[in-house]
Curated annotation (Swiss-Prot):
Its main location: cytoplasm. Poorly processive, error-prone DNA polymerase involved in untargeted mutagenesis. Copies undamaged DNA at stalled replication forks, which arise in vivo from mismatched or misaligned primer ends. These misaligned primers can be extended by PolIV. Exhibits no 3'-5' exonuclease (proofreading) activity. May be involved in translesional synthesis, in conjunction with the beta clamp from PolIII. InterPro entries: DNA/RNA_pol_sf (IPR043502), DNA_pol_Y-fam_lit_finger_sf (IPR036775), DNA_pol_Y-fam_little_finger (IPR017961), DNA_polymerase-Y (IPR050116), DNApol_IV (IPR022880), IMS_HHH_1 (IPR053848), Rev_trsase/Diguanyl_cyclase (IPR043128), UmuC (IPR001126). It comes from Legionella pneumophila subsp. pneumophila (strain Philadelphia 1 / ATCC 33152 / DSM 7513). This is DNA polymerase IV. Binds 2 magnesium ions per subunit. GO terms for biological process: DNA-templated DNA replication; error-prone translesion synthesis; SOS response. Keywords: Cytoplasm, DNA damage, DNA repair, DNA replication, DNA-binding, DNA-directed DNA polymerase, Magnesium, Metal-binding, Mutator protein, Nucleotidyltransferase, Transferase. It catalyses: DNA(n) + a 2'-deoxyribonucleoside 5'-triphosphate = DNA(n+1) + diphosphate. Monomer. Mg(2+) binds at residues 11, 106. The record marks 16 as: Substrate discrimination. One of its GO terms (cellular component) is cytosol. It is found in: Cytoplasm.
């Protein structure tokens, strides 16, 4: 019988913005954001909690963020500094386990099931990691401790910033009952809307549906929903995980009727993709650009082109070519990059959003 797993999700609080406030103390308690220049149609990579009170969020166009908060202080992205801090944190984590799965520069999963540190207590390990990060770098982290990755990630967000939460194995069944379905991995606004149409608001509501029904209604996502609603997630912490692509997509409440409508939503997708690339930090270089279209008959097509950088003109061309394959209304549109699978890493030059 396999032992009950002890999974920790470490998530740095407003990582880029926190570094800026640490390095420039005069910014403390002021609304700040890290991101691109509004004059160059940049996007927000992250912001501090003071800025979030104004409704500012990651991937938001900088110009819009400045409209929400005229006092917003905009800081340029200092990726080399953020990467250095991330490397220190990663080296600290390796003192507790070799089973570390980084998700980005500012968050990672740890499997400490076999760790003997802190008397084998995952709770104490998380507390010690957070304390050591703050002592050495004056940066706060939040942590979630649970029997699996999904619950650990949910828990790390529960007492942000600078807090942690434990979900014990014996408490999982009770914990998930009142959990809003929007907290589940893979449930975005569109999926939440579909679930609400079925009067599904919590995991308890979701548990009333059979796996057969959920598979019929949502395809492979139905199986995921069935398991997550019961606190089940058997995914291992994968230290060998290699990011192969970065992408964003959107399912639209009303189908996009033609290629012009698809091109009209491209700026929003591009802004979100840029923010996701910035969050990923150094990547192995771009190999391909691609677009994905799912038509209103649920048929899907993907078209890609070899490119070593983001190119808005090429993405426009790919959307037009992809749409021409069927010429039908589009219900889902996605764009992304495929990465070079090499050991050398580089920063990506992001283009201007100029359509």
């Amino acid at each position: 019988m396999n032992p009950i797993r002890k999974i920790i999700h470490i998530d740095m609080d407003c990582f880029y913005a926190a570094i800026e406030m640490r390095d420039f103390p005069e910014l403390a308690n002021k609304p700040i954001a890290v991101g691109g220049d509004a004059k160059r149609r940049g996007v927000i990579a992250t912001c501090n909690y003071a800025a979030r009170q104004f409704g500012i969020r990651s991937a938001m166009p900088t110009a819009h963020a400045l409209k929400l908060c005229r006092e917003l202080i905009l800081r340029p992205v200092r990726m080399d500094v953020y990467q250095k801090e991330s490397q220190y944190i990663r080296s600290l984590l390796t003192e507790y386990t070799d089973l570390i799965e980084p998700l980005s520069l500012d968050e990672a999963y740890l499997d400490v099931t076999e760790s003997t540190q802190c008397q084998g207590s995952a709770t104490w390990i998380a507390e010690e990691i957070r304390a050591r990060i703050y002592q050495a770098r004056q940066l706060t982290a939040s942590a979630g401790i649970a029997p699996n990755k999904s619950l650990a990630k949910i828990a790390s967000d529960w007492h942000k910033p600078n807090g942690q939460m434990v979900i014990r194995p014996e408490d999982v069944s009770a914990f998930v009952l009142d959990l809003p379905v929007r907290k589940l991995f893979g449930v975005g606004p569109k999926m939440e809307e579909k679930l609400r149409a079925l009067n599904i608001k919590t995991c308890a509501d979701l548990q009333r549906y059979s796996i057969e029904y959920l598979l019929q209604k949502f395809g492979t996502m139905g199986q995921r929903l069935y398991e997550l609603a019961r606190g089940i997630d058997n995914r291992p912490v994968n230290p060998e995980r290699i990011r192969k692509s970065i992408s964003v997509e959107e399912t639209y409440p009303k189908d996009l009727p033609n290629s012009e409508a698809c091109l009209a939503v491209l700026p929003d997708l591009m802004a979100r993709l840029e923010a996701r690339i910035q969050r990923a930090g150094k990547i192995s270089g771009i190999h391909n650009l691609f677009v994905k279209l799912k038509f209103n008959d649920f048929q899907q097509t993907t078209i890609e082109r070899v490119m070593d950088k983001l190119d808005l003109i090429v993405l426009r061309q790919l959307i037009q070519e992809g749409f021409a394959r069927r010429g039908m209304p589009v219900r889902l549109l996605g764009i992304g990059i495929k990465l070079k699978q090499e050991n050398t890493y580089q920063s990506v030059q992001l283009p201007l959003l100029d359509l």
